[in-house]
Amino acid sequence: MQAKVSWQKKMHFVGRGDSGHEVHLDAKKEIGGEDLGARPMELLLMGLGGCTGIDIVMILDKMRIAYDRVDVLLDAKRAPNPPEKFTEITLTYEIDAIDADVDKVIRAVKLSQEKYCSASHSLSATLSAVVVVNGQKVYDDRANLPE
């Protein structure tokens, strides 16, 4: 896999990967950016959410679980000093499923986190999961709830 990020002006860059799609990146105005794109750390977080989200949809489809909504909310904590890397990331999976087998939905999330999501395996931050099915929290590995 390859990507190229090209400077445009000030702190604005345009990235393009093997897929050919462009992504605009920029810094906040306070440090010289013009707010013309997402921040690099936001993209890292969105990439993680997209990676695990795609896994979840594929796994739910294979399990023949129908769903109306799959949202992945990511809450990241960063170190206070440079390089201000992510130290903890909580992923909350909000899934509206029709006649859902909650255990299978939790299994789909665990498979993504433990086996399939290459983005999560590329990060050194501590990751934790919360699963919400049809508006009800059914799993939270931060609270050591029963699996």
Region locations from a protein language model:
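Extended beta-strand/beta-hairpin segments
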Residues: 1-46, 57-147
